[in-house]
């Protein structure tokens, strides 16, 4: 059994790796297909350890993402907090689903996240990027089963 301190260290390390994977510069053609690793990580911890992960983790990770790449401070923090809240609220239902159905729910969560960021960008007068920004939802849903397996391995249990 893992202590709370050990769990928080693992959550922080996986969130840091996800943040690095999210802000790592890639060629444009590959950047369009990059899954939202940070959102997937926050979703995983919010679903599997709602007390250790969750809204606070979503807010902190979103704030760090805003510092690195957000045009408006707080937009990713708000979007990740809302997605984490929904994941914590529905964590028992989501955990009981098979991987394919979880991927569909993750697709919906990623689409909601992108919509919130899209809406904030529009309200603040920042130019709306191309429709290719929605590909993150599809690639995130495809990557969810292996990502969840890797994160569950880091948690010390098998998927």
Language model segments and positions:
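Terminal, non-globular segments
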Residues: 1-159
